[in-house]
A protein has these predicted regions:
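Cell-envelope and extracellular/periplasmic
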Residues: 22-473
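Bacterial Sec-dependent N-terminal signal peptides
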Residues: 1-24
Length: 473
C-alpha cells in the first residue's frame, strides 16, 4: 500500500510541472510582415518561463535569449538592407515556429482619427477622389504591405491584439488608409524598397485619446479611471487613454522609421486651448515608447470644414497650434491642406482629396529621411508684418522661387484698432511679399489669412504648397 501511494505521488508530480508550450508571438509578428531595414529590430513573445529561445533568421546566424520568470522574452536582431527577396525567421524553444514571406523595407505608422482611418474605398457618402486608378495601381506596387490594428479600447495597456499583414493588391487595397496608401505609393516610387504601413488609428478621437496615464495625470485634468472616463465622455470615441491602451500600445515594440499623423478635428470642440501642449506631449511620449528620441513625425493640418459655423475661428485656432508644434518640436513637419477642399465640401468633414495629402507627406519624408535634399517640401508661412499708413506688407518664408500667380488672391483680411476684420485686396509684389489694403481700414494694425473654420486659400509657393493660415494679433 505504501509503495502504491509513492507511485501515485510520483505521477502527480509530473502533472504539476509546467506543460511544454509552443512559443507564442504577438500577432503583428507574422507571415508577410515588413521589418524596418538596416535596424536593430526588436522581436518578442512568450515561452515557458526560464527556457531558452533560439532565433534563426534566414539572412544570418542564430541567436539565443532566455524567457524571464513570466515567460516574456525579447531580442534585437540586425535586419538586412531593403529588398524584394523573401525572408524567414524561425523561433524555437524546443518546438519551432517559422514566419515566411518577410520583407525588409521602410515601416511607417499611420496614426490619428477618421481622416487617417478613411480607407481607400471611402466612407459612406464620402468617396476618395481617384479611387479607381488607385485600385488599378495597387497590384503594381511591389512589396507594399499594411497591417490594420483593430480599434479597441482597454482600461490597461494591451501587449497584443489580433491582426495580420496584408499584401497590397487590388483585392486588399480597399481597406488600407487612403492617406497611408498614397503616402506609401509615392515613397515607394522614390526609394524602390518595400513599404510597410501600420494603421493604428480611430475616427473621432481627441489627442487625449492617445496620451498615456502618466501624461494625463501630470499635465491634464482628464480622468484615468474607466468608470469616470465613461461618465464624462458618453460618446466612446472621445474617451482619453483607452484608445491608446487598446489600439496603439500593442505596436510599441515594433521597429519603425516614422509616424504620419492626421488628427485635430475632435479637439476643435474639446480642450482646444491646450492642443499644442498636449500634441507635443504625445510626440514626446511616442518617441520615448519607440525608443527613438528623434523619430520623424509628419502631420496634417486639419482641413477646412464649417463645424456648424463656417465663419467661426475655432478650427483656425487649432491650425495655428499645429504650426506652433511644428515650429517648437524637432523633426516635426506640418502639411498644409487649405487648397485641398472643394467649395461644395464645407459640410464634409472627410474631404475627398487624399492623394495630395499622402504625397505631400511622402515628399517630406523623401526630403528629410531619404536623401532627396533638393525637394521643396515646406509650405510657405508668415514671417513678419510691416505697416505703412494704410498699407500692410506681409513677408513670407519658404516661398522658394516665388508665389504662383493667380488673378485674385483670396483669404487675406486686415483690421484696425477695433479688431474688426475686412477682406483685403492682396497684391503680390515680389518673391516673398504681399501688399494688403482695404477701403474699410484706414489705419491697419493686424492681418490674418485663412482664419475661419471654412476658408479656402489660393496662395501657393513654386512647389505648389499652400500658405499656412496665420494671424498677427
Amino acid at each position: 500500500m505504501k509503495k502504491f501511494c509513492y507511485l501515485i505521488l510520483y505521477f502527480l508530480s509530473f502533472l504539476c510541472l509546467p506543460a511544454s508550450a509552443k512559443i507564442r508571438l504577438p500577432h503583428i509578428l507574422c507571415d508577410n510582415m515588413v521589418l524596418q531595414q538596416q535596424a536593430d529590430a526588436r522581436l518578442w513573445g512568450w515561452a515557458t518561463p526560464r527556457t531558452r529561445v533560439i532565433i534563426k533568421p534566414s539572412w544570418g546566424p542564430s541567436h539565443t535569449t532566455v524567457a524571464d520568470k513570466e515567460g516574456r522574452w525579447s531580442f534585437r536582431i540586425r535586419t538586412p538592407k531593403g529588398s524584394y527577396t523573401p525572408l524567414s525567421i524561425t523561433f524555437s524553444d524546443g518546438e519551432a515556429v517559422t514566419l515566411h514571406g518577410i520583407l525588409a523595407g521602410e515601416v511607417w505608422v499611420c496614426a490619428g482619427q477618421s481622416n487617417m482611418e478613411m480607407p481607400l474605398q471611402g466612407f459612406y457618402e464620402c468617396p476618395v477622389e481617384g479611387y479607381q486608378d488607385a485600385i488599378a495601381d495597387a497590384g503594381r506596387i511591389r512589396g507594399m504591405r499594411y497591417v490594420k490594428i483593430p480599434a479597441v479600447m482597454s482600461a490597461t495597456p494591451k501587449d497584443d491584439t489580433v491582426c495580420h499583414w496584408e499584401v497590397m493588391n487590388a483585392n486588399t487595397a480597399n481597406y488600407c488608409s487612403a492617406v497611408g496608401y498614397f503616402f506609401g505609393r509615392r515613397l515607394h516610387e522614390m526609394i524602390d524598397v518595400p513599404i510597410g504601413l501600420i494603421l493604428a488609428n480611430k475616427g473621432g478621437t481627441m489627442v487625449e485619446s492617445w496620451l498615456n496615464e502618466d501624461n494625463l495625470k501630470c499635465y491634464t485634468n482628464e480622468p484615468v479611471d474607466s468608470a469616470e472616463i465613461a461618465e464624462r465622455y458618453p460618446t466612446d470615441w472621445l474617451r482619453p487613454l483607452l484608445w491608446g491602451n487598446g489600439t496603439f500600445h500593442p505596436i510599441l515594440n515594433y521597429s519603425i522609421r516614422g509616424i504620419i499623423y492626421y488628427q485635430g478635428c475632435s479637439n476643435v470642440d474639446h480642450n482646444p486651448n491646450t492642443y499644442a501642449e498636449r500634441l507635443s506631449r504625445l510626440i514626446s511620449q511616442w518617441r520615448s515608447d519607440f525608443k527613438a528620441p528623434n523619430l520623424p513625425f509628419y502631420f496634417v493640418e486639419i482641413a477646412p470644414y464649417s463645424y456648424g459655423n463656417a465663419l467661426d475661428t475655432a478650427a483656425a485656432s487649432i491650425r495655428m497650434q499645429q504650426q506652433t508644434v511644428a515650429e517648437s518640436v524637432g523633426n516635426a513637419v506640418l502639411i498644409g491642406t487649405n487648397d485641398l477642399v472643394y467649395p461644395v465640401e464645407a459640410e464634409q468633414i472627410h474631404p475627398c482629396q487624399k492623394r495630395q495629402i499622402g504625397e505631400r507627406l511622402a515628399m517630406t519624408a523623401a526630403a528629410r529621411d531619404y536623401g532627396f535634399d533638393q525637394i521643396f517640401y515646406r509650405s510657405p508661412s508668415f514671417e513678419k508684418l510691416e505697416v505703412r499708413r494704410d498699407s500692410c506688407f506681409v513677408h513670407l518664408k519658404d516661398t522658394y522661387n516665388g508665389i504662383v500667380p493667380v488673378t485674385s488672391y483670396e483669404g487675406f483680411e486686415i483690421a484696425g484698432q477695433d479688431k474688426v476684420y475686412y477682406p483685403a485686396h492682396a497684391q503680390y509684389i515680389h518673391n516673398s511679399t504681399f501688399l494688403l489694403t482695404s477701403p474699410n481700414v484706414a489705419r491697419p494694425v493686424a492681418v490674418r489669412y485663412c482664419y475661419h473654420n471654412f476658408q479656402l486659400g489660393n496662395v501657393k509657393n513654386q512647389a505648389g504648397l499652400p500658405l499656412l493660415p496665420f494671424k498677427t494679433d
